[in-house]
Amino acid sequence: MWTRKSVLSLVCGALAATILPADQVTPSAWAAKHLVVPDGPQAGQLWNPDQTPQLIEIMDHLSPESPVNEVVLRKSAQLGATTLGIAWSGYVATVDPAPMMIVMPTLDSADGFNREKLNPAFEASPSVARRVMAAASRSARASTVRTKRFPGGSIILTGANSTADLRSKTRRYLSLDEIDDWPLDLDGQGDPQKLAYARKESYDATGDWKVLRASTPTIKGESRIDEAFEAGDQRYWEMPCPHCGGEQRFEWGTKDSAHGLKFRREFPHQAHYVCRHNGCVIHHHEKPAMIRAGRWVASCPGPGRYPSYHLDALSSLFAQWDSIVADFLESKDDPTRLKVF
């Protein structure tokens, strides 16, 4: 028999379910359950955090429950880090609706990102597809090629070469991608990165804005992402040696260093790693377990420093050390090719 108290309890429970805070699920947990990866080794499958464990902490700082406003990722190419921006976008569309902007180097690259990665991921992920308005609709609220609309917010895709978008849109969340490829000056109106930051000024008073900057570095001394990384707390993926347990990050060895990645210049390169603590020889087949046992450690913590992360090919589960060495030897005399490392 229904009583007034039981009915009231049921109604209150249903109401509470609609207004629970977003901390009920983190971005990484959401992605593992809902995000279908559009390309790469995991294409067509749910995102597997076990394949890129380094992204978990970075993703979760993009949750509204994290007090962090800024996150920086300095990365090598082809590490699966594109998933970071896609996952955050899907999370915003389904869990934490708000106005968001994704800024690529150019409008053309923004269109390519949407066509090849973001749109396929959204269409393949049912929870996102249900929330994002269809582009085919004639409604004024329909999505377009460069705008994803959903209840409570929208995601605008644009380029760092677009004066109109960088000067006119108010956004709570900004994902600034490949910032080293952005122009230094936009049509005489200044640094596009500063113009992008101005889009979130309306949220400065509430402090609930977030900015993700991610890029492969270009030329040393001229790199935006290097500067951003060094202004942060400079986190590296530290892993325990499988033989002595000493924590360390993977580094390239040199002729003067006893530790690091060692290899023959001739094929086969026989790449292996020498532990910095006890000189233990670590073989490639031991690398996956090391990476999965790793954690982010800040090398330069301090007041006012935001989380900044360094992720390179040596600690990627997708890359073979011998292949990395072969590519490095081909690229070592070309600074523009070396940036992928």
For each predicted feature, which ranges?
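Phosphate/NTP-binding elements of NTP-utilizing enzymes
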Residues: 2-341
